[in-house]
């Protein structure tokens, strides 16, 4: 038996049973991949007009700059004949499957630093403590089982910890705790406290849980 969500009626019959959500922290910019901006490329190197920048504050990293030039993509874009979408020459194979994917160009954030922008993308708010997208899906749609987490989290590590991610990105916020994601770790114990402690066999642990 599963755990039902709060949405009792759906507009469409669900087709997907599972979702794999990949978040590439520090990945290529969208204007280098899918977001074709010919006017920006044309004005590359020009100063940002006051009509665009307005009164927006700048980050501490840019405080010492006296010039704020526009920066367009250095890569060429090709328009897909069937979908009309544009793809840069960095992703030629992705362009070949343009009919099978959905590219959303209408999303934006006013965050000027990485961490608030990441939290906004994961939760819909720059303020910490809000439920993440996985928690909302668990809350709304439920889960096909009652004995496993609603969703799990895998973090990749390189030579340096460059991912600007923390538990806010998979936290349940003000929703019940069973809607929170469970982080898997590398090594012998991907989930803490599931392995039997030294000197305790499976039968003994079962008796403790049953008691």
Predicted regions and their residues:
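Ligand-binding pockets and gating/stacking loops
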Residues: 1-211
């Amino acid at each position: 038996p599963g755990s039902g969500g709060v949405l009792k009626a759906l507009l469409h019959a669900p087709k997907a049973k599972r979702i794999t959500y990949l978040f590439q922290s520090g990945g290529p910019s969208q204007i280098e991949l899918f977001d074709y901006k010919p006017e920006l490329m044309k004005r590359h190197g020009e100063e940002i007009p006051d009509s665009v920048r307005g009164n927006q504050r700048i980050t501490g990293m840019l405080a010492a700059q006296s010039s704020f030039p526009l920066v367009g993509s250095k890569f060429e874009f090709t328009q897909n004949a069937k979908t009309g979408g544009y793809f840069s020459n960095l992703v030629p194979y992705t362009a070949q499957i343009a009919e099978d994917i959905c590219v959303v160009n209408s999303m934006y954030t006013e965050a000027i630093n990485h961490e608030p922008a990441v939290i906004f993308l994961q939760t819909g708010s720059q303020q910490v403590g809000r439920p993440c997208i996985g928690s909302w899906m668990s809350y709304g749609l439920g889960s096909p089982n009652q004995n496993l987490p609603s969703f799990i989290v895998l973090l990749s590590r390189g030579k340096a910890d460059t991912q600007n991610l923390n538990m806010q990105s998979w936290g349940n916020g003000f929703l019940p705790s069973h809607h929170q994601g469970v982080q898997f770790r590398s090594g012998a114990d991907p989930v803490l406290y599931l392995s039997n402690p030294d000197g305790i066999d499976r039968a003994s642990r079962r008796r403790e849980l049953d008691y």
